[in-house]
C-alpha cells in the first residue's frame, strides 16, 4: 500500500517514519497550526531527530491519507525539509525568505518526484505552501548549494 511505499522512499535515505499522536519535537510539544500539519520534521541541534519523519495519526484526515498517494507526497515534502537542513544547516535558509514551505514543496517536486498537481489540490487555499516559478528557482538554487 501507500504507507509501505512511503516507508520505502524514506528508508532509501536512511530515514524512518514514526507515527505519533501529538505534535512534538524532542519533548517540546508545540501547537499544531490550525490542525493543518499531518506530518512534520524536527530540526534539532543535537541531530537526534535527523533521520525521522513524524506522521500525526490524530490528524482528522489520517485514515484517508494513509490509503492514498498523498501520503507519499507528504513524506517527500518532509524529506525535502531534511535535505535542505543538511545542505544549509537549517530548514529555513535565508534565500527562501518567507517562502520556506513553498520552496520545500518545489524541492520535493523537482528532486523527489512528488506530484505537483496533487500537492496543489491538497493544499488549496494555503498560500504559504503554494508553488510557482519563483519557489522552483529558489529550490533549485538551494539544491545547487546556494542557501543565501
Where are these regions (language model features)?
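Catalytic Zn2+-binding segment of zinc metalloproteases
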Residues: 79-99, 103, 110-116
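A metal-dependent hydrolase signature that marks the N-terminal structural subdomain at the beginning
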Residues: 1-36, 41, 146
Amino acid at each position: 500500500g501507500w504507507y509501505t511505499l512511503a516507508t520505502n522512499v524514506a528508508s532509501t535515505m536512511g530515514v524512518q517514519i514514526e507515527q505519533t499522536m501529538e505534535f512534538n519535537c524532542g519533548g517540546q510539544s508545540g501547537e499544531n497550526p490550525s490542525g493543518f500539519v499531518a506530518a512534520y520534521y524536527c530540526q534539532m541541534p543535537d541531530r537526534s531527530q535527523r533521520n525521522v519523519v513524524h506522521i500525526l495519526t490524530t490528524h482528522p484526515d489520517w485514515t484517508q491519507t494513509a490509503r492514498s498517494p498523498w501520503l507519499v507526497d507528504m513524506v517527500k515534502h518532509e524529506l525535502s525539509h531534511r535535505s535542505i537542513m543538511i545542505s544549509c544547516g537549517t530548514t529555513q535558509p535565508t534565500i527562501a525568505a518567507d517562502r520556506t514551505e513553498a520552496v520545500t514543496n518545489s524541492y520535493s517536486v523537482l528532486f523527489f518526484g512528488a506530484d505537483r498537481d496533487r500537492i496543489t489540490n491538497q493544499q488549496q487555499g494555503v498560500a504559504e505552501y503554494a508553488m510557482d516559478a519563483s519557489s522552483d528557482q529558489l529550490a533549485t538554487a538551494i539544491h545547487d548549494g546556494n542557501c543565501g
